[in-house]
Amino acid sequence: TAWERMGQEGGIQLVLPSLLDELSVLEAGPVDRATTEFPFALSAGERRDYTANTIYRDFGWRRKDPDGSLRISPDDAADIGLETGDQARITTAVGSAVARVEVTDRMMPGHVSIPNGFGLDNEDGTRSGVAPNELTSLGDCDKFAGTPHHKFVPARIEAVA
């Protein structure tokens, strides 16, 4: 019975000894991956209400944000000299792209984001927004799961004249 499985510890033991060695590669806590060269945490591939599935290909769904803007906090935007509608260069260790800026208090200082689903070529030959995969690296990934660190890509943000 479940009661018998609780044993002397007084609860069900969820420790799987076969996984303990594998879990040792995980970090003990949050890791600040920012550097002086790349001081921002870029969330590359943020889900927004108009990027679900493939609806972002329909311009009607993204009238307010046709190119998947770079979201940045008011404090950071002021420090860099950016305002909503300006262009900013996003640079990471593996790539660089230019995005339209949206200044919003929904972002914490030190954090910026771009949505998923952009950077694709349109039928008319134009490209809308930034492709998050062009700013991320397969070599920079979680040691346990092997997935790229899309939610904290060290980045630099600069105003484009």
Short names for language-model regions:
Residues 1-60:
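Long, low-complexity segments enriched in small/aliphatic residues
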Residues 1, 5-6, 58-71, 75-161:
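Long, contiguous, secondary-structure-rich segments that constitute the structural scaffold
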